Amino acid sequence: MEQQPQNTRLRNAGFLTFFFSGICAISSGVVVSLLQEKYGFAYGMTGTLLSLMSIGNLLAGFLTGVLPGVLGFKPSVLLLTTGYALGYGMMGLSGAELLLSVSFFLVGIAKGSAMNACTILVSGNSADRTRGMNLMHSCYACGALLCPFLIAAAGRVSTGLALLVLAALGIIVWLIYLTTPMDGQGSTKSKTGKEKIDWSFLHSVQFWLLTGLLFCQNAAEQSVTGWMVTYFKGSGIITGALAAYTVTVMWGATLVARLLIAFVFPFKQPRKAMVVMGVGCTIFYFFLMQAHTQGAAILLLFAFAFAMAGMNPTAVASAGKMTSVTSMGIMLPAASSGAILMPWIIGRVAERAGLAVGMACNIVPCIGLVLFAILVARMPKEN
């Protein structure tokens, strides 16, 4: 009976820290624009800072997969999640490009580390993994929805105050992890009592298919998140300040979908559900690229985000007992590389053939979602 309250506490710690992580991580896109206005650096520097954050996020996954075998799970999480407080704190000190570069890299490290830690805490301590993961990502979406209003309010006083608020939230994340008992989370024990890394998941075909599916999901989702505002403005479909609120449309759809999956319409057959979601994403994205009116564009963007919302948490939950600190340290960063690669490809294609052609390329990872989901659905279930 004592185990149940402990599991609930660990799961809730994952929910709460992922909510704050949603604020800190998504705020980076707003912060970089504030810093650009304040210090006047070029657009190339803006792209570099965001790329460094993505690289930090990628590296964090590998570090959280290896460091627990040396330091233990909790010390590793505490070390790596200092990045939010340190990163945003350093941004407020100076506009030096080197310091800003290090700051965004540290924020990326914290983002990836929090993702890994929360996945372990929630997935390993939820009776229903699919519901738990969808609820966890709903917490992140709530934070993402809140961050523009929080930064705007603090930014009215000064950019420095906005950065200080984010650094304070980073400290809160760290303190929650500090006070959460995490012994034995995401690891196995050897006869000597030390944590032993289990690499058996590397031999699982299902693990690599799920990683491929998440790679496509990250690629498709980040491309829309990163490029859609620019695409809408450039094409004249949505103009002015309204274009910036398309991000709110996406996160609103994401939150609604994940809450519905978690509480109203839970998936009885998650693998088949991923196939349906993949098909939905592909169809809605195809018609989104054909939209020429503001109403149709917003409606199709909402539908795309709604269809995409359950893919990531459902795929991670489908990993079952393969969900360990080490396996997530391989799966999540490998998958997140799609979020680095596809937006870059769109940019390169757009330079040569126009942004419309570049955005059309994003249909490729959407189709990849369908193919990987079908392959996963045909695999024998691994608990």
Task: Give the predicted meaning of each segment.
Residues 128-129, 134-182:
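Helix-loop-helix hairpin linking two adjacent transmembrane segments in secondary transporters
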Residues 28-29, 204-256:
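Extracytoplasmic gate region of multi-pass secondary transporters
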Residues 40, 72, 93-98, 127, ...:
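Helix-breaking motifs and short loop linkers at transmembrane-helix boundaries and internal kinks
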Residues 59-98:
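Conserved MFS/SLC helix-loop-helix module at the cytosolic interface between two early adjacent transmembrane helices
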